[in-house]
Amino acid sequence: EECGPNEVFNTCGSACAPTCAQPKTRICTMQCRIGCQCQEGFLRNGEGACVLPENC
């Protein structure tokens, strides 16, 4: 699968990945999900792009 900038494909990524709105990793009991996730150190913004925290 093609991923966007600053993303990586993960076969078992967190279903509760950190975002600009919720930057702290939260306790997650949901199953892992297959798909593109932000690279380490990046957060998903409101438009769905992976950005550095200072660009949120």
From Swiss-Prot:
TIL domain boundaries: 3-56
Cellular compartment(s): Secreted
Main localization of the protein described in the UniProt heading: secreted
Disulfide bridge map: C3-C36, C12-C32, C16-C28, C20-C56, C38-C50
Keywords: Disulfide bond, Protease inhibitor, Secreted, Serine protease inhibitor
Pfam families: TIL
GO MF annotation list: serine-type endopeptidase inhibitor activity
The UniProt record lists the keyword Secreted: yes
GO cellular component, one term: extracellular region
Annotated InterPro entries: Ser_inhib-like_sf (IPR036084), SerProtInhib-TIL_Domain (IPR051368), TIL_dom (IPR002919)
CDD domains for the chain: TIL
Protein purpose: Chymotrypsin and cathepsin G inhibitor.
Protein family (similarity comment): Belongs to the serine protease inhibitor-like (TIL domain-containing) family.
Protein name: Chymotrypsin inhibitor
Source organism per UniProt: Apis mellifera (Honeybee)
